Amino acid sequence: MWDARAVRRIGHRGAKGHSPENTIESFAKALELGCDEIETDVWLADDGRLLISHDRPGPDLKLTLQEVLDFCRGKLAVNVELKSEMSEKAAQETGGSVGKLLAERRDPDAYVSSFWWAALEGCRVAGPAVRRAFIFADSPDRSSLMESARGMRLWALHPNRTYVTPELVKAAHATGVKVNAWTVNEPREIARFREWGVDGIMSDFPERVPKD
């Protein structure tokens, strides 16, 4: 489903600007809006379920990652953000659980992303073939970041929109790593990122990301 010639239209938490985030309704809206991919958030619950929520899920939350993957399969790629409490152990367990599920499903259009290196490592151990992306919202040393990307065999970097630069995109591509920016809602910024060669743009209003 990846077209190297076009910028990916990625719906942030589905189509957050139009429908309640991280719901089947929102993912269906993203599909209606012509998204190539959706981003969603997953937590490992105490009972072992993988629950969909941006914040730590409450007792009434029931939507699971399995259900989202089933809905999206063959229609939308899925960027699964691995969420965790402030604990590397918990992050690694979450990554391991999601990595195991994705490896078992062998879904080529699903991958993981996280702020937590431990979560990405947990996924790598449980599902070595599952693609992984590192999320950041700061300005890390570029050479160190690329070295880490190579060492972790990352598929992509996911910088916050504030930290996207032409130099970052160029360095990532030279390393063999894609760049998917978040969360980009302003048309002028979307146009600028396209000019810089960003591979994917996550947006609350994904219809604003041109398809050609």
Task: For the regions a language model picked out, list residue spans one by one.
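Phosphate-group recognition and catalysis centered on beta-loop-alpha active-site segments
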Residues: 1-212
